[in-house]
Amino acid sequence: MLACASAGPAFADPAGIWRDKDGGTIRVHRCGAALCATIASVEPRLDPTTGQPWTDKHNADASKRSRPLIGVQVLSAMQPNGGGKWSGTLYDSDRGQTYAGNLIELGPDSIRIEGCALGLCGGEELSRVVK
């Protein structure tokens, strides 16, 4: 999947809770002058394979695979990178990999999180739940 986006004007502070297309949420917060984010909820709540709460089972680091997915940091050190764009590190819990990533403000209640590897970029739009 190839996704292209250009940074637009800066909107409201992107800190808050954001919902993805599957109903899960992340909590974006300040970490110094940067932005970070952690998983706040997942949907469905239980892993259908195990019947238990989701864990970080795809993590490349085997010692982290049994940790609860809720609370896992998914955005790190996101620094301002032009009008409404923040760039840093993205952890993809579906693949257990870390990539260069961006948080792009699309509007006051909409952001796009995207990551790139080997020149291919993909991402997802999220909607604001709580500021």
Which residue ranges define each predicted feature?
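N-terminal signal peptide c-region/cleavage motif recognized by signal peptidases
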Residues: A5-A7
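N-terminal helix-cap/turn-to-beta initiation motif at the start of protein domains
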Residues: P9-I17, C121
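Central antiparallel beta-sheet cores of small beta-barrel/beta-sandwich binding domains
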Residues: A15, D20-D92, T98-G101
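Structural motif
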Residues: C31, L106-G107
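Residue-level recognition of beta-strand termini and adjacent short loop/turns
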Residues: G82, G107-D109
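Short, exposed beta-strand-loop hairpins at the edges of beta-sheets
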Residues: A100-L103, S110-E124
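Short beta-strand-to-coil "C-cap" segments at the C-terminal boundary of structured domains/repeats
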Residues: S127-K131
